[in-house]
């Protein structure tokens, strides 16, 4: 055991948060404690980022009318997605894919503008800025689960429409709509698995040695 390892209880808590993290869609009414929200944002801001560029930006949506407008954008994309799914369209429309009008806090996570100035680590992999934002959101997700707070990542929207709605600068890009709030329970398994939409595959299907050998 490394001398730098956490205690057994601390390690167990971290692995539990990872295992029990869920993409939540069902929330009960009620605000999120401001101190807790700050802790979640601090957790996100502590994420690693390519070239230390910290490309994430968070917009807290507190205006009720704006929340309704965001919901309308998501609902329009939900219907477009259903149409694109073909034979699974009706099945998809039965899924609850967001909790925008129900959650206690609504955030929009975005990529900053003028990202082209940051070349370190992005010259051949420019999408590492998106990877950095994803790390920040995963930090927030795990912190939320540890706090007993539900979090849902909504990706059903047209980024340009949301950018304009929120008066974001040219060159920036909306990445995620984040729902945070109290829940009655956490799903025992991912919701899409509960709803028989998809089944996760075991780890051994995704780990290879030396060469790409999986089908």
Regions found by a protein language model. Give the residues of each.
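Glycine-rich phosphate/pyrophosphate-binding beta-alpha loops
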Residues: 45-51
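Short secondary-structure boundary segments
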Residues: 111, 156, 182
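C-terminal helix-cap and adjacent tail motif
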Residues: 2-13, 17, 24, 177-215
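A glycine-rich helix N-cap at a beta->alpha junction
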Residues: 78-84, 168-190
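Small-aliphatic-rich amphipathic alpha-helix that forms the alpha element of a beta-alpha
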Residues: 44, 107, 115-165
């Amino acid at each position: 055991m490394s001398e730098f390892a956490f205690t057994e209880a601390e390690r167990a808590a971290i692995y539990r948060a990872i295992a029990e993290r869920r993409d939540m869609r069902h929330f009960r009414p009620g605000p999120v404690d401001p101190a807790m929200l700050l802790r979640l944002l601090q957790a996100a801001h502590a994420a690693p980022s390519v070239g230390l560029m910290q490309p994430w930006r968070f917009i807290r949506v507190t205006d009720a009318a704006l929340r309704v407008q965001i919901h309308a954008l998501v609902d329009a994309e939900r219907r477009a997605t259903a149409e694109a799914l073909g034979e699974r369209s009706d099945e998809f429309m039965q899924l609850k894919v967001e909790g925008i009008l129900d959650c206690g806090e609504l955030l929009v996570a975005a990529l900053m503008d003028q990202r082209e100035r940051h070349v370190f680590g992005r010259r051949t992999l420019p999408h590492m800025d998106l990877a950095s934002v994803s790390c920040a959101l995963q930090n927030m997700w795990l912190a939320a689960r540890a706090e007993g707070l539900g979090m849902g990542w909504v990706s059903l929207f047209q980024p340009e429409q949301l950018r304009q709605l929120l008066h974001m600068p040219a060159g920036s890009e909306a990445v995620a709509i984040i729902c945070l709030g109290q829940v009655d329970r956490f799903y025992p398994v991912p919701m899409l698995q509960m709803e028989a939409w998809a089944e996760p595959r075991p780890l051994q299907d995704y780990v290879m040695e030396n060469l790409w050998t999986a089908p």
